[in-house]
Every structure is written in C-alpha cells, then in structure tokens.
From Swiss-Prot:
Protein name per Swiss-Prot or TrEMBL: Probable alpha-mannosidase At5g13980
Cofactor(s) this protein cannot do without: Zn(2+)
Record-listed E.C. numbers: 3.2.1.24
Substrates-to-products reaction catalysed: Hydrolysis of terminal, non-reducing alpha-D-mannose residues in alpha-D-mannosides
Cofactor note: Binds 1 zinc ion per subunit.
Presence of keyword Hydrolase: yes
Length: 1024
C-alpha cells in the first residue's frame, strides 16, 4: 500500500471514529461508595389530586389553558424510560392517578410494570390515594384513604410501601409521624414545608433530619426517621429542571456543537451537593429531581440525568447515582448515627416573614363540614353494609370511599383549590353519597325485617343543615304516621336529642314499645326560613312547597351499633301533646339577667350586653364568668409592602390580618328566649349577616352554640375573616392545647416554639393552629374546653379566651399558586351572594383534670352523629317491624368507655376489617387512661371467629411482620433502643380467649374471617 492510500485510510477511520464518538453510552451503574459524598438522585413527579384543575382534568390533560399537565403522559412515558436503562429509577405517590392508569393498561404493560416494581426501578411510596393534608383531615379519614391505596398495592403487586412522602402539605401533624408513619410500616417520612425560622436554625445545627416521636403515649415504639428538605421538593439550586418546557441549561456534551458545557454543569451539580452536605449529617444527601407534574416526556429528564451522573462520577469529587428514598433511608440507618429528637409537630408553617399559612385551617368551611359529614356517614354505612352483607353486584360504599379519599388531598379539604375544583370534590362526594344512601336504606329494610310486600323504603335527610327534610315535613292529619329510625354507630349506648322540622303542632312521639316519649316543639324562626328557602332553591333548583312551623325535639335512647325506632303521629286525646315552647322577646332594660338551663347546668345572659355572662354547674360546683363575642379581621392588602418584593395579601393559604374590628349588635336587638322541657334556647341576631342560637339541653352539662355567618359584606372593598371569642377568667398563662388531627392534644404557648427562639412578626396569625376536635385552656383549678363540628383555625390570643375563625371571604390572592381570591358564592339563577355558613361548637367548664372525659366521649358523638332514616306508615296499614330495635353486638355488651370503634367493614374477599382505638393519652384521665380490654366474641354475636390476624394500621401486612422489618434508630442522649422505659402495648390476642388489650393511644387493626352457619347465606348475616 502506498503512502497516499495509507493516509486516506487513516483519515477515513478517524472520520468514522469521530462520527461514532457522538453516540455515548453513559455509565449510570454507580451505587453507594463508602467514604465519598453520595448524592442520591431521586426522580419524582408531584401530581396534585386536584388543585388548579380537577383530578380527571389533570389525569387526561384537559383544560390546559389553566395548567399544562397530564398525569397519563407521566405514567405512559415513565415505563419505556425505565426499560431503556435498568439503573434508572422513579418513585410514584398518588394512587388516585396510578389506579386510573393501571385499569387502562394491557396485560403486557401490567406485567412489565410489575417487573419494574419488583426490581426496585419503580417504587410506590406513601401509597395513599392522595398526599393528604395534615391540618384539616380527621385521623380516621387519613387512615381510610391510606388503607385504600395500600390494600390495592399489596393486592396487585404484593409489596408494602416503606416511605412516607408528604412533600407538599403546609405543615405537618404529629399524627402523621406516628399513626400514618410508623404504624403503617414506614421507616421514614420526608417533607418539604417547615417554618422558615425553624429551617434556618436546622441548617446551622444540621438537624433537618431527626427522629420524630409524635406521640408521648406511644413514645419510641412509634417513632420514625423524618427528613425536611433543604428548600422544597424541587431540584437543587443551579438549574436542573428538564421538562420539555423548562429553560434550565442542558448538559451539552457534543464537542462538535456550540455551547459545550460539561464542566460547567458538573461544577454546578457538585457545588449544590457540597452546599447541601454542609447542612446534612452523614455522607449521604438526596436530590429530589422533579416537581409538580413533571416527566410528561420522561426522556427529557433521564437524558440529562444520565449525563450528569456519568460526568459527575468521572469528575470524582462526589458520587452520584439513581436512588429512591428507601435506598437513602437504608444508607442513613446503616451509618449507625444517633439522631436529634423531634417531638410534637410542625405547625404553624410560614415560608417567610408575615406569611403564616394558617388561613387554610378555615378556608372553605362548607366543604370542610361536608367532608366531615360524609366521613361520619361512611363509617356508619360500612357498618350497616356489613350487617346486611356486602353486595357483589348492587350498590356499595366504594364510590363514597373513593370520593372521601380524594377529598383528603392537601388542596381539597384544605380549601386551597380553585372554585371549580372545590365544586368537583363536592360533586364526587354527592355521587358517592347517593350510592351509599341506597346501601343504608336496603340494609335498614333488611335489619328491621319489614314485610317486603309493603315495599318499605327508608328515606334520609342530607339537607337538615339547611332545615330541609321532606321526609319529616309530611302532613300527618290524615292518619299517617312517620317512622323515625335512629342508628348509633358508636360502640356505647347513647342518649341523644333528635331535631326535625315538622309542619303541624298537634303531634306526639312514641317509642317502639308504644310508650310516649317526651318531646318539645320549638318555633321555626325567620333566619331558618330564609336560609332554607334560598339554599333549597340553590341546590335543588326549586322552592320548598311548604314552610315548617316547628322543630320537633325529642330524646332517643339507642343501643351500641344499633337502632331504635320512634313513631310520630297526630296526637290522640289520650296522648300528651308535644310541649310547645314558651317564647319571650326581651329588649335591653326590660330584664337585666336571663337564665336558661335544665338540671345541673345554668347559663346566664345579660340583656344589656347581649351575651352570656355566667356559667354555673351545680354538680361540679363550677362557677365561671363567660362572655362570647364576634369580631372580624380585615384582610391585609400587601400592595404597600416594600419587602419582600412579592406583596403578601391574606388569601386561601395565608392569614394576614390588618386590624381587629368587634362586631356589635346594630341597634336594640331583642334576645329571643325559648324555654321548654328538653331544651332552652337564646336566639340573637348579632347583625344582618350573623345570628346565633345558644342551647342548654336537659341532662347535658355543656353549652351548644349554633351560628349562621354570611353573606359577609364586601361592598367596602375589604376582605373579612370572621371569628368568635369565648372568654373566661381562667389564668391560662399564654398556654392552650389543640388536637393533632383529632387524636392527641398538643401543648401550645403563645409567641413560643419549643424548637427555636421565635421572632414574632404576626402575633395573631403566628399563634393560630388547626383544630379538628377541640381546644382547651386550664389553670390550677379549672379546664375550659371547646369542641368543633369541622376543621377550623383557632387560638388563645388572650389569656382565658378561646378564639375560632368561622368563615373567610377575601378579595385578593395570596400569591401561592391558586391565582384566585377566596370569594365563595351561592347562586339562585343569575343572582349570587356570598356563601352563608351554618355550624356548631360546644363548650364546657370542668374541675382541673376532669375535662378529658367530656372531650373524648362527646368528641366521638360529634364526629359520629346518629344516622336518621324515615318511613311513612298509612293508617290501617301498619308497618310491621320484625325488629323495631337492633344491636349488632351482644345485647349485654358495650365497648369500654375509653375505646372507640373506628372501622367495621366487610371487604371484597368476605373478610372483616376491624379497628379499635384507645381514646385517651397516657395520664390524661385518672381512670380512663388505663389499659382497656375488648371481648371480640361479643362484637360478633352468634358467629364464630374462624381466623384472626393482627395487621398494620393500613391492613396491608401482618403486624408481626411489620415489627420485624422495622428499623431501629439511635437517638441523641438515649440508649441504642430509645427510651429505657418503652410505652406499653396490648398483648398478642389469644385465639381462644379473643380479648384485645389496648393501652393509651393504641389503635389495633385485625382481619377476621367469620365462620357462618351453613344454613345462612352470606348476605343474611344477622337473620334471627
């Protein structure tokens, strides 16, 4: 070969080599390297289950004029991206989306996805239907929505989620740490939002990662490793966003092209890693590579991350690799480090000065109430579905379960979505209710054993909150009777009051044995008539055909997990009529003091002040001056703010008051006082848009306050946040107690945080906390407790005083993404007015140390009200009940006073899911904080418990298996296994004795297989 040909050949080879060099095989196979800084690259997408768009719009990618987001694309594109490189990983959270997608896939895709999950490339973490909020949901709802997701995952993939991933909720509940963390089998929980002052201190002390011990009762037995991200849940600083619409610099590694920047991007990555390492213990850090609705075209992300991992590892200063939070947690655990201890919770949350996210504790109070009502209904409906037997083809409670699960999302019940999305959440609940209502009606017909030829139909009244109940508003003058069935979902016998609108006054009430029951007629007032008419037209599109004259009030006694029936009919001459109430309108100066109350409790009102002034309980010798008032905070307009650059308004998330304005009665408004044998009431019209009724019931030792707030006026261009204050003389010393998601109570001190020295810049908003269950004050002699009917925000801004925020109507957005002011309206045809809220709270004063029993017991009654159903009975055609009363448990038995039934549910496979909860904390009550014992046999009378398996809280694995897998963490200042004195837990259930022990704050979950007599079909579970 001559020289010329040889040189040509060499040039050709070099040319081929140069062309081929443009195809790179990136090395993504690195794993943990001891001694180096290990950067765990965690690809994820945060997919809100509704926020700016509805859940379905987000899934299919519609309504993109609001936000370009399509979760279907995310999941579609992740699968081939993972298949392209076995080292790539991805985590997914929201089961509401994943299950929609899964149900649409072919068997081949399902097989591939299962392989990806089992290989660890795709990890399902958190595992609930949504990433639930932690301020507004009740703990039972949090458990239910998590269970729904976890049981799907174990059924389809035979895996159990290990990691909590609460990266976006706006503050974090202690219940999340121990109940929805450790008790569901999680080894760690990660989140993005903690107070900016707290975060700054944790930067300096390297305490972003802690051992979180959320329950003082369960202690180290339910602690969890918890990590707060350095900033949020997004990629690290330096420009690492790779959605096709993002503008971060890509890794341009082709030297033949302009803008080659490999070293520049490596340097940015390493700099971000070293910065994060400086605030993190142990040589492992996590980069959260993703944010809201990312990976819609997954290859754009993985192409860049492949390059980064490849070139960063060639650089050698740090070690980068694809990872998951599970791998990260195991690495932290393997270091055998002792970690700082965190107790209590992460409320309230502020992301900067003057920006406390405490407004959403109250935002959309009607939706919050609707969620709570549906939660209680679902609990009762599942019980009745079990008693009858779950239908395999007909209506069931699944639709309501799904709707409730989605409603727990941190932009749903929180009240922080756009209005059309809030409407969608409510619509889903309404659809779920209709199907569950059918389940309840057929179950009750089955259990009452009414002659089916009579075509028995039990109606229900969902709109009693607006005083509308067609079933009770029937004309009984023609000889008809109304059957009222009251079902008690609690595990105790219950004596309660029923209030129903009726059209006539000559009625009497009889129990199932024909004995007359004492009753009272309370006149229907103007505020009820107006509220009823407007909202019936708004919701049903038609006006009520008649106006009730009275509320019929009577007392019912109902067995545990059972019902009793009552008959309302036209009073016969031999009957005693329902007692009409004595009504008086008292003007200022006519009578200085008015007293109401039956039995031990007396409440005094001042006509001069127009408010309650004195509370007296003769049984406990408690006498206390009280005063209840209304105020509003004008919403701050941040347009004049100089710092920060973005003005801070009060909005759906943020509460920023700009002055407090008392709301006083306009002119001389009379107190309308109603006296009767069962209840005394004081009606007050505070102003044209606020009214309230204060009630004291016979035999009860608490005060009930029903309020109506709205239409809040905004003609002055100022948003308003309406609060009520209940004042006492208690010397509470800046201290008060609020519940954690309806479970434990946490001590709060005004203007103080236990974890850092608080810089007080918002003395009102910065002292607000979420209230799901109640709030109380105490001094050395007394306890003052207030219980609520939904999630509210509240505080004790002044010693001796409880403050609740009841309603918000705002005209500005707070710049947190929703881009819509919180101005809810209700429309009749083309006329819209501000939303009116009706609700209740309750208060009571007890000797010091004795208030817990009322809070815990009555709290259960508030959460689980009686379920009422109605049937008409024609004269001459009596409805013959085979069972006019019923109890689903042994008639001689009830649950202990300190135990609540959380779940009684028949599952698809015929097994029964049972959850029981100890209601008290350690040392909360002298007697009821002790160990409780439940005889499980007596919960299933006449049935044999064939097999019983104790499960994790979310019922996706045996508890014994979960405990064996649990990681044990060291805590600074403690021994290797935490506290020397561990919290007590109930003993293993003996399969012969079948007794369950529960210690304070313990919840135990069991799966039960019932062996039914062969002569009984599955759906005739409670035939006589």
């Amino acid at each position: 070969m001559d020289l010329a040909k040889f040189l040509c050949w060499i040039v050709l080879l070099l040319g081929i080599s140069l062309v081929e060099s443009r195809y790179m095989v990136y090395n993504t196979s690195h794993t943990i390297v001891p001694g180096k800084l290990n950067v765990h690259v965690v690809p994820h997408s945060h997919d809100d289950v509704g926020w700016l768009k509805t859940v379905d719009q987000y899934y299919v990618g519609s309504n993109n004029s609001i936000q370009v987001a399509c979760v279907q694309n995310v999941l579609d594109s992740i699968v081939p991206a993972l298949l392209a490189d076995k080292n790539r990983k991805f985590i997914y959270v929201e089961q509401a989306f994943f299950q929609r997608w899964w149900n649409e896939q072919s068997e081949e895709i399902k097989r591939i996805v299962k392989e990806l999950i089992h290989s660890g490339q795709l990890e399902l973490i958190n595992g609930g239907m949504c990433m639930h909020d932690e301020a507004a949901p009740h703990y039972i709802d949090m458990i239910d929505q998590t269970t729904l997701g976890h049981r799907f995952i174990i059924r389809e993939f035979n895996v159990t989620p290990r990691i909590g991933w609460q990266i976006d909720p706006f503050g974090h509940s202690a219940v999340q740490a121990y109940l929805l963390g450790a008790e569901v089998g999680f080894d760690s929980v990660f989140f993005g939002r903690i107070d900016y002052q707290d975060r700054e201190k944790r930067y300096k002390e390297k305490t972003l990662e802690v051992i979180w011990r959320g329950s003082k009762s369960l202690g180290s037995s339910s602690q969890i490793f918890a990590g707060a991200f350095p900033t949020n849940y997004e990629p690290p600083p330096g420009g690492f966003y790779y959605e096709i619409t993002d503008d971060s610099p890509v890794v341009q590694d082709d030297p033949d092209l302009f803008d080659y920047n490999v070293q520049e991007r490596v340097n940015a990555f390493v700099a971000a890693a070293l910065d994060q390492a400086n605030i993190t213990r142990i040589n492992h850090i996590m980069f959260t590579m993703g944010t809201d609705f990312r990976y819609q075209y997954a290859h754009t992300w993985y192409r860049q991350m492949d390059k980064l991992i490849h070139y960063v590892n060639l650089d050698g200063r740090v070690n980068a690799f694809y990872s998951t939070p599970s791998i990260y947690t195991d690495a932290k655990h393997a270091a055998n480090e002792a970690w700082p201890l965190k107790t209590e919770d992460y409320f309230p949350y502020a992301d900067r000065i003057n920006a406390y996210w405490t407004g959403y504790f109250t935002s959309r109070p009607a939706l919050k109430r609707y969620v709570r009502v549906m939660s209680a209904y679902y609990l009762a409906a599942r019980q009745l579905e079990f008693f009858k037997g779950r239908s395999q083809k007909g209506p069931n409670t699944d639709s309501l379960a799904d709707a409730l699960a989605i409603a727990q999302h941190h932009d749903a019940v929180s009240g922080t979505s756009k209005q059309h999305v809030a409407n969608d959440y409510a619509k889903r609940l309404a659809i779920g209710y209709v199907e569950a209502e059918s389940v309840v009606a057929t179950s009750l017909a089955h259990l009452t054993k009414v002659d089916p030829t009579l075509n028995p139909t039990f109606q229900q009244c969902l709109l009693l909150n607006i005083s509308y109940c067609p079933s009770s508003e029937v004309n009984l003058s023609d000889g008809k009777s109304l059957i009222v069935l009251a079902y008690n979902p609690l595990g105790w016998k219950r004596v309660d009051i029923v209030r129903l609108p009726v059209v006539g006054g000559d009625v009497s009430v009889h129990d199932s044995e024909g004995h007359e029951v004492e009753s009272q007629l309370v006149p229907f007032t103007d505020e009820y008539v107006a509220l009823r008419k407007y909202h019936v037209e708004a919701y049903l599109g038609q006006s009520p055909t008649q106006v009730p004259k009275y509320w019929l009030v009577f007392s019912v006694t109902v067995p545990p997990l059972g019902f009793t029936t009552y008959t309302i009919s036209t009073a016969k001459k031999t009957d005693g009529y329902s007692s009409k109430s004595y009504v008086s309108n008292i003007l200022k100066g006519e009578q200085s003091i008015i007293n109401i109350g039956h039995g031990h409790l007396k409440l005094s009102f001042s006509t001069d002040q127009g408010t309650a002034i004195n509370y007296v309980n003769g049984r406990t010798s408690m006498t206390e001056p009280v005063k209840q008032t209304f105020s509003y905070y004008s919403a701050y307009n941040g347009s004049n703010d100089k710092e920060p650059l973005i003005p801070q308004n009060s909005g759906a998330y943020v509460f920023r008051p700009n002055g407090t304005f008392p709301i006083n009665p306009e002119g001389q408004v009379p107190l309308t006082v109603i006296h009767g044998p069962l209840v005394d009431e004081v009606h007050q019209q505070i102003n044209p848009w606020i009214s309230q009724i204060t009630r004291v019931y016979k035999g009860k030792e608490h005060v009930e306050v029903e309020f109506i707030v709205g239409n809040i006026p905004i003609d002055d261009g100022i948003g308003k946040e309406v609060v009520t204050q209940i004042s006492s003389s208690l010397k509470s010393n800046k201290t008060f107690y609020t519940d954690s998601s309806g479970r434990d109570y946490i001590k709060r001190i005004r203007d103080y945080r236990s974890d850092w020295k608080l810089d007080v810049n918002q003395p009102i908003a910065g002292n607000y906390y979420p209230i799901n269950h109640g709030i109380y004050l105490q001094d050395s002699k007394k306890e003052f407790s207030v219980m609520v009917d939904r999630a509210f925000g509240g505080s004790s801004i002044v010693d001796g005083q409880v403050e609740l925020m009841l309603h918000r109507r705002l005209l500005l957005d707070d710049s947190r993404g929703v881009a819509e002011n919180l101005n809810e309206t209700v429309c009749v045809q083309d006329k819209c007015t501000g939303l009116t809220i009706q609700g209740k709270y309750y208060y009571r004063i007890d000797p010091y140390g004795e208030g817990a029993k009322w809070r815990r017991t009555f709290g259960q009654e508030i959460y689980s009200p009686l379920l009422l159903a109605f049937a008409q009975q024609d004269d001459g055609k009596p409805m013959s009940f085979g069972a006019a009363s019923f109890s689903g448990i042994d008639p001689s038995y009830s649950l202990p006073d300190n135990v609540a039934l959380l779940t009684l549910q028949e599952l698809d496979d015929g097994n029964v899911l049972l959850r029981l909860a100890h209601l008290y904390e350690v040392e909360e009550d002298k007697e009821l904080s002790g160990v409780a014992s439940v005889e499980l046999k007596k919960l299933f009378p006449g049935k044999k418990i064939g097999k019983l398996t104790e499960m994790s809280l979310s019922a996706n694995q045996e508890r014994s298996t979960m405990e064996k897998k649990r990681l044990v963490w060291k805590v600074e200042g403690e021994g290797s296994y935490g506290e020397e004195k561990k919290a007590k837990r109930g003993r293993e259930i003996d399969p012969r004795k079948l007794e369950m022990e529960l210690y304070p704050m313990e919840i135990r979950t069991v799966l039960i297989h019932l062996e039914l007599p062969s002569s009984h079909s599955r759906i005739n579970r409670f035939d006589a």
